[in-house]
Regions:
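Sec-dependent signal peptide recognition
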Residues: 2-10
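Bacterial Sec-dependent signal peptides at the C-terminal "C-region" and cleavage site
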Residues: 12-22
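Acidic, low-complexity terminal tails and accessory targeting/binding regions
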Residues: 20-23, 95, 108-119, 181-237
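Active-site-proximal alpha-helix that buttresses catalytic centers in soluble enzyme cores
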Residues: 23, 28-97, 141
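Residue-level preference for the first positions of well-ordered beta-strands
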Residues: 25, 164-170
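Phosphate-coordination/substrate-recognition cap region in phosphate-metabolizing enzymes
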Residues: 61-128, 194-196, 202
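Short beta-strand scaffold positions
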Residues: 76-77, 150, 170-171
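Short glycine/proline- and acidic residue-enriched helix-loop micro-motifs
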Residues: 128-147
Length: 237
């Protein structure tokens, strides 16, 4: 009987220590480019399109917003616009911040559609299908959203198993949308439900590789010039 009590006591300690372990993730979408400012909106993907002047300004503003926070290392996508954004954020911080290029955070490959508008890529019928059923999207020479979700899970596990307590991610719209689904354990059908504007900032508490708590999502009131300055928290529909 004593052994049974000892077992449950040790088990309770293990559960308690597991519950108390919490890490923090900051998410920042890369700054505006001429592709995202285009009213027709072009699929950027892995195309090397630099930040425009507003994108640079907003990246610095995001850096100011985070300047007093312990943001740890900044893990950024290899795509240049994400690296640019990360560099501007790091320069605004009060302590030296290490930048780490992370291939798992690279933007989606939109294959033959990269650089095209949604209309050019999908047309009316397929474009509507993309909005209603993003989980069914198949792009010639591109990457499926399921493949993206799998590689993002690998990054999440790698962070959880590391000694780091804080992780800051600078990546892209499609990547952050899918990360939000992982955080909320939502299906790919909800891909459009948790969007962030360029240089929007989100903060998430990670309690295990399966348990997350969103502190705030898409904070952007510091982007005074933004056309979409709504500081909203989107809800899963």
């Amino acid at each position: 009987m004593r052994n049974i009590y000892s077992f449950f006591f040790l088990l309770s300690l293990l559960v308690l220590s597991f519950a108390e372990k919490t890490k923090t993730i900051y998410l920042i979408r890369n700054g505006e480019t001429d592709f995202t400012s285009d009213s027709l909106h072009r699929l950027s993907g892995r195309t090397n399109i630099p930040l425009n002047n507003l994108g640079i300004s907003h990246s610095k503003s995001a850096g100011d917003f985070l300047s007093n926070q312990n943001i740890g290392k900044i893990y950024h996508s290899p795509v240049p616009r994400a690296k640019q954004t990360a560099e501007h954020i790091a320069k605004q911080h009060k302590t030296k911040v290490e930048l780490v290029e992370e291939p798992l955070l690279i933007d989606a490959s939109f294959g033959i559609y990269e650089g095209k508008t949604y209309q050019e890529a999908f047309g009316n019928e397929q474009g509507g299908e993309f909005l209603l059923h993003p989980e069914k999207l198949i792009i010639p020479e591109g990457e499926t959203f399921y493949a993206i979700m799998n590689r993002l899970r690998l990054f999440i596990v790698k962070f959880w198993e590391s000694d780091e307590e804080v992780c800051t991610i600078v990546s892209h719209g499609s990547i952050i949308n899918i990360l939000s689904l992982i955080f909320l354990q939502a299906p790919l059908e909800k891909f459009w439900s948790m969007k962030m504007i360029p240089c929007g900032v989100s903060k998430v508490h990670m309690k295990s590789i399966y348990a997350f708590e969103i502190d705030y999502w898409n904070a952007n009131t510091f982007l005074q010039e933004s056309k979409n300055n709504s500081n909203r928290v989107c809800q899963i529909l």
